[in-house]
C-alpha cells in the first residue's frame, strides 16, 4: 500500500502530537524523499549522541582523575544508564510507530522522527555531565 506524503504527516502529527514531527523534512516533494530526509536526520542525531556520550565520559575521567575508583564508578553508572536509556528510546519509538505497518515507509519515518526527537532530549542531559 502506498502512503501519500499528506497521510504520513497527518499520521505523524497525531502520533507525536508535536510540531517537530511535521516540521522535520516536511518540505520534501515525495514519500521517498521524506524517508531519505528522516533517515539522514536520524543518522546525524545518532552521530551527535555518540559524540556527546564520548565527550561526557572524557569530562568524567578528567573531573575525577584524582580518584580513579570514583571515576570508574561514575563511568560504569553512565554506561549502564545509557544502555537503559537506549532500551527506553527504542521501546518508545516502537510505540509511536505502532499504528503504521511494520516495514512500511510510514513506520520507518515515524521511528526516525521519534529517534531524532528523543536523541536531542538526551543530548541536553549528556551535556550536563558530570553533574
Q: Residue ranges of each PLM-predicted region?
A:
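N-terminal signal peptide c-region/cleavage motif recognized by signal peptidases
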Residues: 14-18
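Bacterial N-terminal signal peptides that target proteins for export
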Residues: 1-8
Amino acid at each position: 500500500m502506498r502512503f501519500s506524503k499528506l497521510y504520513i504527516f497527518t499520521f505523524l502529527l497525531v502520533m507525536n502530537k508535536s510540531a517537530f514531527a511535521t516540521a522535520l523534512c516536511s518540505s520534501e516533494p515525495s514519500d521517498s524523499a521524506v524517508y531519505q530526509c528522516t533517515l539522514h536526520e536520524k543518522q546525524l542525531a545518532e552521530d551527535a549522541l555518540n559524540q556527546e556520550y564520548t565527550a561526557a565520559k572524557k569530562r568524567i575521567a578528567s573531573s575525577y582523575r584524582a580518584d580513579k575508583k570514583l571515576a570508574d564508578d561514575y563511568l560504569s553508572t553512565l554506561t549502564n544508564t545509557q544502555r537503559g536509556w537506549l532500551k527506553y528510546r527504542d521501546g518508545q519509538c516502537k510505540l509511536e510507530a505502532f499504528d503504521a505497518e511494520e516495514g512500511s515507509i510510514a513506520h520507518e519515518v515515524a521511528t526516525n522522527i521519534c529517534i531524532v526527537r528523543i536523541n536531542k532530549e538526551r543530548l541536553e542531559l549528556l551535556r550536563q555531565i558530570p553533574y
